[in-house]
Amino acid sequence: MTQEKKKFDAEVGKILNLMIHSLYSNKEIFMRELISNASDACDKLRYLSQSNSELTSGDSNFKITVKVDKDKGQIIIRDNGIGMNKDDLIENLGTIARSGTANFLKSLSGDSKKDNMLIGQFGVGFYSSFMVADKVTVTSRKAGEDKVHVWESDGLGEYIVSESDKEFTRGTEIVLHIKKEEDTFLDHFRLKHIVKSYSDHIAVPIYFFDEAGNNEIQLNSASALWTRSKSEITEEQYKEFYKSLSYAIDDPWITLHNKNEGAIEFTNLLFIPSSKTFDLFHPDRKRRVKLYIKRVFISDENIDLIPSYLRFLRGVVDSEDLPLNISRESLQHNSVLEKIKNAITKRVLGELKKKKEESPEEYNKFWANFGGALKEGLCEATTDHEKLLEVCIFRSALHNKMISLDEYIAGFKEGQNTIYYLSGDNPDKLLSSPQIEGLLSKNIDVLLFTDTVDDFWVNVNSEYKGHAIKSATRSDIDVEQTTSQSEEKNADSKKSDDEYKLLTDYFKETLGELVKEVKISKKLTSSPACLAVSDAAMDIRMERFLIEQKQIAAASAKNLELNPKNKIIEKIFNDLKANNKNNEELVNLIFDQACILEGEPVADTGAFSKRLNDIVQKAIL
């Protein structure tokens, strides 16, 4: 029997070092991981055997067995699943480049509970064996192949792979040589309790040998939890299934267990977590909803089973209408799967709308966790945008609480027909923005958008239920006309523009190409000035984001709006009427101040500093 000694992949070494020197209190998770892996191996073979029945010839009843040998200090876990050949053993146990190990290491928080769950989420669960074992021996024979291979390691940097001539049927056997200090895991009663706690939802029967090692006792019902009636399932069973499936430490916030018996037959058991998932916005995040066909696991990768914006969902979907021998490629553009996806989306959004109305405080917590992802759907062409907007909530500047668009509309002032918003990074800064002072002074609410995605979806959704959605930075906002559209008001507005032409022309001449236009503001009440953009122009924050991403080269010139009721602007205007045009420095300072308030760069910081110093000096002398 030839042996081949190999070094672990560098990233595996880091994981092993973490496991071997683990201080985690919940070391029993090694059993959860090994049972889960064994179940997956059986699921894979069950799927492959649909198109090649010879793979399971003579042994089509899948099972997992667990045995304790106290005398040898061993725990043995055996399955008759897909098995592994030499290449599989090296790829799956010697390297884990596919498992996102670097991301796993970065995500470690030092919180033992959270870190324990990360082990499974990143696919490095096998290595948790080294928390309790000082040597691990894996014997395996791949379905459809004759050769038996053994993988063995003490976890200290190297492993051995060898071919074996021992009699061994299809599947995998893992022998854990338990550390002396962890020998409590050899206690028959304790291990049986651990296995049972992690096996109730597993669809493969799990057998536990008695202390004599002769008789097998089945520990689980081996029926998929989602196939049972809701009345037969306890809340604790739902929780345990959720935690095992998603490697979570929280309880599910919402559980959706439904059987669809219409034109398309399928069962869904879906969960919405109560805590934010660590990889929600990670580029190589995994989907956490598994597709089954007639209780046979098919895939949880590269299938369009749920929309991306609902990626926080956890659970399973089991279809009766898809053929078992369907290829993963065929699932990409499958009409049945598309109908299932639409039905699930409708069901989830319906449940969210119900929760929003019945439990607003709970919903606020959900929104803080997953609202950013949910709003991504508003940028997708295939989304029912109105249905999705119905479950969105935003911070109200007027009431300082989260409200829906429907609640905003219900609070319209007489004659108001527009939904106003202001976007930025910090809600407190937005509240003090001059852009909204006039609207708020008239008790006209403004929604505060602080997620980056907000700047994208408002470009796709310009209205909601017939009401325009408009940024408060737009030049055409007139707080006096927002609630009244009389011709008399329009005439007054035109008269105001003409009256202050001397003022606006002076600002434009002084600032030149720094501004596109200078206008008299219809929305400022106390601030001297603010930047604004026309309806056709890009929102200020959106433009800044695209510049940061190097999508556009430079910022465009903005409009400058002046408040003629402000004392500073009034002084400049009076000076102009007296033919005094010596306020260029003050004009530039007002413009720089408006830029700073919008987060825009000041054109010349040195000149700005000098102007500011000169004005302060004049004030104190």
Swiss-Prot record:
Pfam families on file: HATPase_c_3, HSP90
Compartments reported by the entry: Cytoplasm
Annotated region (A), positions in chain: 1-328
Keyword Chaperone annotated: yes
Region (B): 329-544
InterPro entries the UniProt entry points to: HATPase_C_sf, Heat_shock_protein_90_CS, HSP90_C, Hsp90_fam, Hsp90_N, Ribosomal_Su5_D2-typ_SF
Sorted UniProt keywords: ATP-binding, Chaperone, Cytoplasm, Nucleotide-binding, Stress response
Record's GO cellular component terms: cytoplasm
Keyword Isomerase appears in the UniProt entry: no
Primary localisation category: cytoplasm
Superkingdom field: Bacteria
MF GO annotations: ATP binding; ATP hydrolysis activity; ATP-dependent protein folding chaperone; unfolded protein binding
C: annotated segments: 545-621
Quaternary organization: Homodimer.
Listed PANTHER family: HEAT SHOCK PROTEIN 90 FAMILY MEMBER
HAMAP family, per the entry: HSP90
Assigned protein family: Belongs to the heat shock protein 90 family.
Function: Molecular chaperone. Has ATPase activity.
Protein name, per record: Chaperone protein HtpG
Upper lineage: Bacteria, Pseudomonadati, Pseudomonadota, Alphaproteobacteria, Rickettsiales
